[in-house]
Amino acid sequence: LVAGTAAADLLAERLGIDLPDDRDYATAAGLALATLKRLPEEGESFALQGWRFEVVDMDGRRIDKLLVSPAG
């Protein structure tokens, strides 16, 4: 379980994923928004570089928690 406010760089390092150098986000929530290109609803998920990210909690229009697990 990852907080939306978690640093994207640290998350990428721990998961072994590559983030674009020219990205305009710094958090896990920003990564989700950049990937989905819209505000998600609770329960939505996406896959990225072998990992599944599920939005498990929204606080209004803010992504509060993401569940990250191996895609498969």
Annotate each language-model stretch with its function.
Residues L1-G72:
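Cytosolic regulatory modules rich in charged/polar residues
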